[in-house]
A protein has these predicted regions:
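Unchanged
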Residues: 21, 35-139, 143, 152-161
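N-terminal strand-loop-strand
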Residues: 1-31
């Protein structure tokens, strides 16, 4: 998984996943990234390859700032997997060329993410159950779930500045 950050203004790339039958994250906001391939040398290579495939951005190792904590789904209804997010800071905003897995993309400025009013519950109906999840309301579709959990520590650090 790649967090792609650009300056002027400081912004983060978010994608909305395409609607696909059987995909539990279908239609949700997220970050570029996906399954590792046997050809990948490691999860960093997976993040670089998947970002290139999904949004047409060729990330360079020199743009890698660091690795965030691994995140896994908390629901027993989701596939057992582990996501390792890598933070890349680019010198300028690249052209985004989404593939068929990406319905749309947007650049969200950090000011919006750290604004206290953007972080509030998102209500989801799961069958007969209604649940609330923490979410960033910075796009037409709230950013919640694993993506929210990836972003939260970073947003906390930025808000502390």
């Amino acid at each position: 998984m790649a967090l792609v950050v650009v300056p002027d203004p400081d912004a983060l790339l978010l994608i909305r996943r395409a609607e696909r039958p059987g995909d539990p994250w279908s239609g949700q906001m997220g970050l570029p990234g996906g399954r590792s391939s046997p050809a990948d040398a490691g999860l960093l290579e997976t993040a670089i390859r998947e970002t290139r495939e999904e949004v047409g951005i060729s990330l360079l190792r020199e743009e890698l700032v660091g690795q965030l904590d691994d995140v896994a789904p908390r629901s027993p209804h989701l596939p057992p997997l582990m996501v390792r997010p890598f933070l890349f800071v680019l010198s300028r905003r690249p052209i985004v060329i989404p593939n068929s897995e990406v319905a749309e993309h947007l650049w969200v400025d950090w000011v919006s993410l750290v604004h206290p009013e953007s972080y509030r519950p998102h209500t989801i109906r799961l069958g007969e159950t209604v649940r609330e999840f923490p979410a960033y309301h910075v796009s037409p579709i709230p950013v919640w779930g694993m993506t929210e959990r990836i972003l939260a520590p970073l947003v906390e650090l930025l808000a502390a500045d």
